[in-house]
From Swiss-Prot:
Any one Gene Ontology molecular-function term assigned to this protein's record: DNA binding
Biased composition (Polar residues): 1-11
Major place of residence: cytoplasm
Family statement: Belongs to the ABC transporter superfamily. UvrA family.
Disulfide bonds: none
Pfam families: UvrA_DNA-bind, UvrA_inter
The protein's role, per its UniProt record: The UvrABC repair system catalyzes the recognition and processing of DNA lesions. UvrA is an ATPase and a DNA-binding protein. A damage recognition complex composed of 2 UvrA and 2 UvrB subunits scans DNA for abnormalities. When the presence of a lesion has been verified by UvrB, the UvrA molecules dissociate.
PANTHER family given in the database record: UVRABC SYSTEM PROTEIN A
Residue numbers spanned by region Disordered: 1-30
Any one annotated GO CC term: excinuclease repair complex
Designated name of the protein: UvrABC system protein A
ZnF endpoints (C4-type): 302-330, 791-817
Length: 992
């Protein structure tokens, strides 16, 4: 997989920077219209020489693990990036990521390079589809310039207030009300404001960040801190006869503060919110709810006199990353963590003494303390600590969860056996968890407390992220939050159909053009079902990649080398055509595209095809074909050519399994996201494919509803399923297994051997060798995670990090163990001539042959080979595995577990990253699971898998609001006859 996880732009010079070796005799090809690679040896590449045309769409294909990504990303793109970085100053390089020099003799014809891979854009909860495409930035500008503010209280459009109207409102204050007339010249801006203080030096007093100061002796402000400065224009007490003075003061303040004036009621003492100090705006109320400040605007205010004044609308007002626009409750996140009682009390059969309250049962000292406190509460309320939680009264359970406002008497014996008593308040377990979560500085403790919480929409903004004032600024009748919730196609219709006045049209014309152009690109890559408020962290790898692709098209760059990693992942066949047209448009602008791809349609449209093989891993790394599609089909050495020409194929099953009558799962009334009260039956004991165009509701139905219900009921999980009425038929199942594409580990110490458990058996075998027995070595000696057998110089990592100050950190092999991870004594123990480090470095297929005599080991390894991972090294770090590889490692691990035929396996696009031949192997594994009586339920777009299924559930007919219904169910042949099914149309062609 590519090393660079984000869209990276790098310039690469035509000449060979860094003194790369030339070809034989120093000759150069001199071909300006081609990219030439000579002597590529990265990873499993075997001294590869290849050339292909520029300004063309070039597809790199081949079996999974054959070396496609090693050539495309780790060699060609990496060299382009390295040349660009080396052209920068050492100071600039300090801020860039580490760039490895690929193992290649030379590359010629490189252009500035852009890598667009499948890694998610980022996990920042503040990033959305709108922000990463920059559409939201243009929307903020549009709403700020032509939006019509409305009063949050009455909904009326706000209007401007005259000085006379402001004075009239102030005169309604009670007699003898003392207040100051302030001119807010600075509101929540960073700076020292030295010049401003100099200009105001004769104005008397000012309120600076809540403190009254003399302007003749102003404070020194911190430049990087936001400040609020208001000139004190007048101090008044409301009484008869001050109208003229009040009018003069208001007019003076309005002039000083550009149309703003604030009345500060000096007798109101605001109640400070714990831990917060807000100096960015005028706020605060006393215990009775009376405001300390009241703002007035000469520009915008409510016609009905509601005291909440709308400030001047600016683009920053619509940013949920800015305190002026963000919802004050959730600070712009749109959600908040809340303790869930169901997670706090995991088992209501237990009593308090038995640990029903999980947060108070973590460790003996914690448990003993809270049992004493709960004992005091029990005495006060009359319940026993031995009563099961479910048998406590509602009031008693509520007291334990939420606390009581009275004191409880706690009795305990000290270490001398003497009885002691004291009284204490009882805050309850939910306030306790919330308090500890807010106070802790430990990441581990924070994660522990968050395990008792669920994320819920913010109750103040209902997930809109913005404050009420901003949410009442409307364009075309919609707030900016409402507009971000529209699916892309509806958003396109909304913005293109906006009715604006001539003046508004003149202001908004250019902004609307930018918004519509970006929306059009997103539609072109098949993302019409997404909306702009969708968090970036929830996007699949394919969706994130296509968003970046759309952004690049919008940039209009020419002469660029784009390197893409399977852009068709997650796309239905219907949407694939539009994606290919988008790629061709990018090429026609004058760019070169290298597309790592298995999709047959994309390969067919390529200008040039490079097939890497002939097999995977150690048996690949060669260029099997470089040229046209016709020549590839004729190449009998190419496995890809065999499938494209029809010499090999994945056959339609001779017979399909017939579901046993009555043995079904039934989901009723599914209504989450775009599902429209869907009810569907999932037959058990068969292979079922869930299909439909992107955004039709497949993942919502299976992952968000069905799987979570099954996990809760069968596995004892505490997940929150999507909205539905019921799920029936669970009595037919004992276990659910969810095999997704999340990593098998987040450190290099995790690998296929450790995840599947085969490493335990291998270590045990090494411990049983004669040499190990003589030395007294136990199984733990062969672990690189604990002291004893590992190399202590690198703590079992095999590498050492060298800090280079202004240069990136360099990772070098450990000088003691030379990357083997183990010490010399451990490596002296061998089995069949191989030590433990050499075994971990074997491809899994080779290791399976090596350990063939030991069934316990070979059974694990054969399963990994069966799922198409024979090329992966046994000890390959988890961080280097792709999502598809990680998913297949998990599948192999599950295949090792004994099954009674009552297990349902839920998979989400298991064919991701797989070649035709690998899909054939995967299907064999899935069919073998079903042959044992289990159920396999897979979300899938791949037609070879769909045609091999026993049962198909097709959702649609479209994505987003146009989907969410069941279009067809039945065998692939029955779905192929469904007129409304897009999947059926493609199946019909395949089954004909």
């Amino acid at each position: 997989m590519p090393k660079n996880s984000s869209t990276t732009v790098s310039s690469a010079v035509e000449a060979h920077a860094g003194g790369l070796a030339s070809g034989p005799g120093g000759a150069r090809s001199g071909e300006r219209d081609r990219i030439v690679v000579q002597g590529a040896r990265e990873h499993n590449l075997k001294d590869v020489d290849v050339s292909f045309p520029r300004d063309a769409m070039v597809v790199f294909t081949g079996l999974s693990g054959s070396g496609k990504s090693s050539l495309a990303f780790d060699t060609i793109f990496a060299e382009g990036q390295r040349r660009y970085v080396e052209s920068l100053s050492s100071y600039a390089r300090m801020f860039l990521g580490r760039v490895d020099k690929p193992d290649v003799d030379f590359i010629e014809g490189l252009s500035p390079a852009v890598s667009i891979d499948q890694k998610s854009t980022n996990r920042n909860p503040r990033s959305t589809v709108g922000t990463i495409t920059e559409i939201y930035d243009y929307m903020r500008l549009l709403w700020a310039r032509v939006g019509v503010p409305h009063c949050p209280q009455c909904g009326e459009p706000v209007s401007r207030q005259t000085p006379q109207q402001i004075v009239d409102q102030l005169e309604e204050l009670p007699e003898r009300t003392r207040f100051q007339v302030l001119a807010p010249v600075v509101r929540g801006r960073k700076g020292e404001f030295v010049d401003l203080f100099r200009d105001l030096s004769t104005q008397g007093f000012a309120v600076v960040d809540g403190e009254t100061v003399q302007l003749s002796d102003p404070p020194v402000l911190k430049k990087q801190v936001k400040h609020t400065i208001a000139v004190v224009v007048d101090r008044l007490a409301m009484k008869e006869g001050i109208r003229q003075r009040l009018t003069d003061s208001v007019e003076t303040a309005l002039k000083l503060a550009d149309g703003l004036v604030v009345a500060e009621f000096v007798d109101v003492e605001p109640v400070a919110e714990k831990g917060k100090k807000n100096t960015a705006e005028f706020g605060g109320r006393d215990a009775e709810g009376n405001p300390r400040y009241r703002s007035f605007s000469e520009k915008l205010s409510c016609p009905n006199g509601h005291e909440q004044t709308v400030d001047e609308i600016e683009p920053r007002s619509f940013s949920f990353n800015n305190p002026f626009g963000a919802c004050p409750e959730c600070t712009g996140i749109g959600s908040r963590l809340q303790v869930d009682p169901d997670l706090v009390v995991a088992n209501d059969e237990l009593s308090l003494r038995e640990g029903a309250v999980v947060p108070w049962s973590l460790g003996k000292s914690t448990s003993d303390y809270w049992l004493r406190v709960l004992g005091g509460l029990g005495k006060e309320m009359g319940f026993s600590l031995d009563t099961p939680w479910k048998d406590l009264t509602e009031a008693e359970r509520d007291a334990v969860l939420h606390g009581k406002d009275f004191k409880v008497e706690v009795t305990f014996r000290n270490r001398f056996g003497r009885e002691r008593r004291y009284t204490t308040g009882f805050e309850g377990v939910i306030p306790y968890v919330m308090r500890k979560h807010g106070e802790t500085e430990s990441d581990g403790a924070r994660e522990r407390y968050e395990s008792f919480m669920r994320e819920i929409p913010c109750p103040a903004c209902h997930g809109a992220r913005l404050n009420p004032t901003v949410l009442n600024v409307l364009v075309g009748g919609l707030s900016i939050a409402d507009a971000t919730r529209l699916p892309m196609r509806e958003a396109m219709e909304f913005f293109s159909g906006l009715r604006l006045t001539d003046r508004e049209r003149q202001i908004a014309d250019q902004v609307l053009k930018e918004i519509l152009a970006r929306l059009a690109f997103l539609l072109d890559v098949g993302l019409e079902y997404l909306n702009l408020e969708r968090p970036a962290g929830t996007l699949s790898g394919g969706e994130a990649q296509r968003i970046r692709l759309a952004t690049q098209i919008g940039s209009g760059l020419v002469g660029v080398l784009y390197v893409l990693d399977e852009p068709s992942i997650g796309l239905h066949q219907r949407d694939n055509r539009r994606l290919i047209e988008t790629l061709l448009r990018l090429r026609d602008l004058g760019n070169t595209l290298i597309v790592v791809e298995h999709d047959e349609d994309t390969i067919a449209e390529a200008d040039w095809i490079v097939d890497i093989g002939p097999r995977a891993g150690e048996y690949g790394g060669e260029v099997v074909h470089s040229g046209s599609l016709a020549d590839l089909k004729a190449n009998t050495r190419s496995v890809t050519g065999d499938y494209l020409s029809g010499r090999r194929s994945i056959a339609v099953p001779e017979r399909r399994r017939v579901p046993e009558k009555g043995r079904v799962l039934t989901v009723r009334g599914a209504q989450e996201n775009n599902l429209k009260d869907v009810s569907v039956q999932v037959p058990l004991g068969v292979l079922t494919a869930v299909t439909g165009v992107s955004g039709s509701g497949k993942s919502t139905l299976i992952n968000e509803i069905l799987y979570k219900v099954l996990a809760n009921r069968l596995n004892g999980a505490k997940l929150v399923p999507g909205r539905h009425r019921s799920v029936e038929g669970l009595e037919h199942l004992d276990k659910v297994v969810h095999v997704d594409q999340s990593p098998i580990g987040r450190t290099p110490r995790s690998n296929p051997a450790t995840y599947t458990g085969v490493f335990d058996a291998i270590r045990k075998l090494f411990a049983e060798t004669p040499e190990a027995k003589v030395r007294g070595y136990q199984q733990g000696r062969f672990s690189f995670n604990i002291k004893g057998g590992r190399c202590e110089a690198c703590a079992g990592d095999g590498t050492l990090k060298i800090e280079m100050n202004f240069l990136p950190d360099v990772y070098v092999p450990c000088e003691v163990c030379h990357g083997a991870r183990y010490n010399r004594e451990t490596l002296e123990v061998t089995y069949k001539g191989k030590n433990i480090a050499e075994v971990l470095d074997m491809p899994i297929e080779e290791a399976a042959d090596f350990f063939s005599a030991y069934t316990r080991i070979s059974r694990y390894l054969d399963t990994l080979v069966d799922v198409g991972l024979g090329y992966v090294r046994l000890g390959q770090p988890a961080t280097t595995l792709s999502g598809g590889e990680a998913q297949r490692v998990k599948l192999a691990a599950e295949l090792q577990k004994r099954s009674n035929g009552r297990t349902i396996y839920v998979l989400d696009e298991p064919t991701t990253g797989l070649h035709f031949d690998d899909i054939r192997k995967l299907l064999h594994v899935l069919q073998s699971l079903v042959d044992k009586g289990n159920t396999v339920l897979t979300i899938e777009h791949n037609l070879d898998v769909i045609k091999s299924a026993d049962h198909v559930i097709d959702l649609g007919p479209e994505g987003g609001s146009g989907g969410g219904t069941i279009v067809a169910t039945g065998t692939p042949e029955e779905v192929a006859r469904a007129a409304e099914s897009h999947t059926g149309r493609f199946l019909a062609e395949l089954l004909a």
